[in-house]
């Protein structure tokens, strides 16, 4: 059995803040960390760690090439990830406050540029008995 995670691949910019920025407010962050993220990426890595033969499909910009390296290091196949020119990788701006709560601003970027042709090619490499895992952060869900 193979699993295809067709979903978002994001760069997460995580800011540690005293409190969430309010309307009209400028707030200095205590720290900034950059992580790989996106529901598709996170789910693919979790499945691979659990022993599943896992592929991910989606899209990144040139700035997201490091996400493919992280997926490969986790034994996730990236054959069906497109690297797009002139489109930024999807990203999340995450505020984490001192209580552990968060607020997230999401930019779809390349996640919103998946094509029907790309979906057809990716899905064509899987068959009955294989699994398809989707989430709502890509643009071709109605087609897929």
Regions found by a protein language model. Give the residues of each.
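A structural motif shared across PLP-dependent enzymes of the aminotransferase-like
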Residues: 16, 36, 62, 89, ...
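Glycine-rich phosphate/adenosyl-contacting loop at the front of the ribokinase-like
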Residues: 1-57, 66-69
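Ribokinase/PfkB-type carbohydrate-kinase core domain
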Residues: 1-9, 69-83, 94-144
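Thr-Gly-centered strand-to-loop micro-motif
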Residues: 30, 37, 90-91, 134-135
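Short Asp/Glu-rich motifs
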Residues: 65-67, 90-91
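Beta-strand->loop->alpha-helix junctions that form or flank phosphate-binding loops
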Residues: 31, 57-62, 78-89
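Acidic surface patches and DE-rich sequence motifs
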Residues: 21-22, 61, 97
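Short glycine/serine/threonine-rich phosphate/pyrophosphate-binding segments
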Residues: 39-42, 88-89, 141-143
């Amino acid at each position: 059995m193979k699993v295809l995670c067709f979903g978002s691949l994001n760069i997460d910019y995580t800011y540690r803040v005293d409190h969430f920025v309010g309307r009209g407010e400028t707030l200095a962050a205590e720290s900034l960390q950059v992580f790989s993220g996106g529901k598709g990426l996170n789910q693919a890595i979790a499945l691979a760690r659990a022993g599943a033969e896992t592929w991910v499909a989606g899209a990144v910009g040139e700035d997201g090439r490091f996400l493919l390296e992280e997926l490969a290091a986790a034994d996730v196949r990236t054959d069906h990830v497109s690297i797009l020119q002139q489109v930024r990788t999807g990203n999340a701006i995450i505020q984490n406050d001192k209580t552990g709560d968060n607020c997230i601003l999401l930019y779809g970027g390349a996640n919103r540029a998946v094509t029907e042709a790309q979906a057809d090619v990716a899905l064509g490499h899987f068959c009955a008995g294989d699994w398809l895992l989707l989430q709502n952060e890509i643009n071709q869900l109605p087609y897929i």
